[in-house]
Amino acid sequence: MIAKTVSERGLLPLIDFAYQGFGHGLSEDAESIKTILRHNDEAIICNSFSKNFGLYGERVGAVSFVAGNSDAATAVQSQLKKLVRCNYSNPPRHGGSIVATILGCSELTQKWESELANMRNRIKALREQFVTTMKNTGKGHDFTFLLNQSGMFSFSGLNKMQVDQLKADHGIYIVGSGRINVAGMQESKMEKFCSAIATVLEG
């Protein structure tokens, strides 16, 4: 277990928590953090509201430090204040105010959670459609392993050469690691997308 190993080695966990709600649910996605904190007294958590609130242009997020004691909390707070002062001093408040307004109103919070659930279900459906369409290309390409993944992105297994070929021959852009933005898939273009991938896989 990672959380236990981190504790045994005296490491300070730094958790990138950018996509809460897109995996299995708001609470469910936070289980990994809860597990780490059950085994560790301290942790740094970096979370973002840019994705799950649709605020990409605002870059809204936070860094939280879970301290083992009050002295550690005070020391970290003083260092964070210095970093803030050196980097941006006073951040724009527009995006943060939007998040605060939504989370401060139960009706808006409920609506946001519902919309987030709809997006999560849409992503899941697109992933399933992709797997089915790849299977139905008639070329025996099995991508069922993607069904074990969740969230906005999936690692396709495509290598850098195949990714470059997708770009050059089919005008399809994905990152060099083969990571696909599932949320960016379109149901109406799935067959074309899968056909291009099948062609690339066959070399």
Predicted regions and their residues:
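Catalytic PLP-binding core of fold-type I/II PLP enzymes
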Residues: 1-26, 39
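Structural signature of PLP-dependent enzymes
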Residues: 77-96, 102-131
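Active-site PLP attachment segment
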Residues: 32-75, 79
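Alpha-helical subdomain
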Residues: 21-30, 34, 82-89, 137
